[in-house]
């Protein structure tokens, strides 16, 4: 068995894996234990009461966090004409059509989000094997295939997070950085949970949001008492 580092021993001693933490206590604990030499992200795992084997129970979408994610997001947009000018004005770093596709085929992937107008999907569709495995393929469900590319760019820059359940029915995403205030992290988490509740599949039965845990990049997960969150039902 691998020997625990001193840091991991401290984390294990401090975090009670059997306890549900009040949100403010959980954030305070994460901040106390975030001793890495960089500003760690605060990540969230949400266990959903869905059957991920059934396509009509999969949960996928996007929402803009009120306080952003703390990341500088570089955006590439496939579009043309007036939409191209609008995308540039909204702050997109890369805008194009076939020329942008050629850059990507050549391995130039200096972006975090890809957005496309519907008329550009004939070009983007040929990049599926490159963009798909990286989670970058535009999709209407996440608002990244849209006629209003300028709004999509602004959302991406404002701190939009995309979510999609994994094969175990768990959503993994980020809600900010450990140097955010407790209020910012709480409100970002509440916004995410509210969005997930709105995206609940009609056929899902029983308890929908089963467990919510937050952690830092290098830390352990802390389970949240959902009663301490203010979310839309």
From Swiss-Prot:
Q: Which InterPro entries does the entry mention?
A: Ribosom_uL1_bac-type, Ribosomal_uL1, Ribosomal_uL1-like, Ribosomal_uL1/biogenesis, Ribosomal_uL1_3-a/b-sand, Ribosomal_uL1_CS
GO CC entries: cytosolic large ribosomal subunit
Keywords of this entry = Repressor, Ribonucleoprotein, Ribosomal protein, RNA-binding, rRNA-binding, Translation regulation, tRNA-binding
HAMAP family named among the record's database cross-references:
Ribosomal_uL1_B
**Assembly with partners or alone:** Part of the 50S ribosomal subunit.
What task does this protein carry out?
Binds directly to 23S rRNA. The L1 stalk is quite mobile in the ribosome, and is involved in E site tRNA release.
What protein name does the entry list? Large ribosomal subunit protein uL1
* Organism taxonomic ancestry: Bacteria, Pseudomonadati, Pseudomonadota, Gammaproteobacteria, Alteromonadales
The gene name reads rplA
């Amino acid at each position: 068995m691998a020997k625990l580092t001193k840091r991991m021993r401290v984390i294990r001693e401090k975090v009670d894996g059997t306890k549900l933490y009040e949100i403010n206590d959980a954030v305070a604990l994460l901040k106390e234990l975030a001793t890495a030499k960089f500003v760690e992200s605060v990540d969230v795992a949400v266990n959903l009461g869905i059957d991920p084997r059934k396509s009509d129970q999969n949960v996928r979408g996007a929402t803009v966090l009120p306080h952003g994610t703390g990341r500088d997001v570089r955006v590439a947009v496939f579009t043309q004409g007036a939409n191209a000018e609008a995308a540039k004005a909204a702050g997109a770093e890369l805008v194009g059509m076939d020329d942008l596709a050629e850059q990507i085929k050549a391995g130039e992937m200096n972006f975090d989000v890809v957005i496309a107008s519907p008329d550009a999907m004939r070009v983007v569709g040929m990049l599926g094997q490159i963009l798909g495995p990286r989670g970058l393929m535009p999709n209407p469900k996440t608002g990244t295939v849209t006629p209003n590319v300028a709004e999509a760019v602004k959302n991406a820059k404002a701190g939009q997070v995309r979510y999609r359940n994994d094969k175990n029915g768990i959503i993994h995403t980020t809600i900010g950085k450990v140097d955010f205030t407790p209020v910012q992290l709480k409100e970002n988490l509440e916004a995410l949970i509210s969005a997930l509740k709105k995206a609940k599949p009609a056929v899902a039965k029983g308890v929908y949001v089963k467990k919510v845990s937050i952690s830092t990049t290098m830390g352990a997960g802390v389970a949240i008492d959902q009663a301490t969150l203010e979310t839309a039902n």
